Amino acid sequence: MSKYTFTQKNFKVFEVPGLEGRMSAIESEIQPKLAALGTYFTDFLNTHTPDEFYAHIAKHARRTVNPPKDTWVAFSTNKRGYKMLPHFQIGLYEDQVFVMFGVMHEAKNKNHYIEVFEKHFDEIENLPDDYRICTDHVKMEKPLIKDLSTDELKEALHRAHQLKKGEFFIARTLSPKAPELKTDKAFKSYLEDTFDHLLKFYS
């Protein structure tokens, strides 16, 4: 049994109807793996940065009717939460695993953090071909950076600056049958490599 890797059974959790049923499946099937990833990558980030990180598993506590379409573990330097700070996420939808770093619209000093991305604009454009951006964390769509023009990428950062609900993340995704999900070793190696790239934008 895999400790870290998401399996086909895990992805099928998002087919369970109803809030109560899906939350029960998330808690039993996915959250133990999110907890294991949380422990492993908290240690990883604490080793690779001068700061102390904490893992936050999504609780979906505000939901009263609609079941969640995704779930995740987030990493931030605040023990009580992550939305107000730049943070890392590992999570999954029905047909996507995502790893990302950036800021939500709730972030304090959001513009400062967006400016960090802008200062590293050339590095964003030169990331490996499978890196993406996410401008709305509740949507699965994450366009590949290589498919965006320089102007389109600058516009995404500009919108994150100017719009109250603006957000910006650098992301990487896997399909459920990706070879990186075949073993815990392969998945951890993929995630470590991704975090190494994302840490370029952590400041």
UniProtKB/Swiss-Prot annotation:
It comes from Staphylococcus carnosus (strain TM300). InterPro entries: UPF0637, UPF0637_domain_sf. Belongs to the UPF0637 family. It comes from the Bacteria. This is UPF0637 protein Sca_0732.
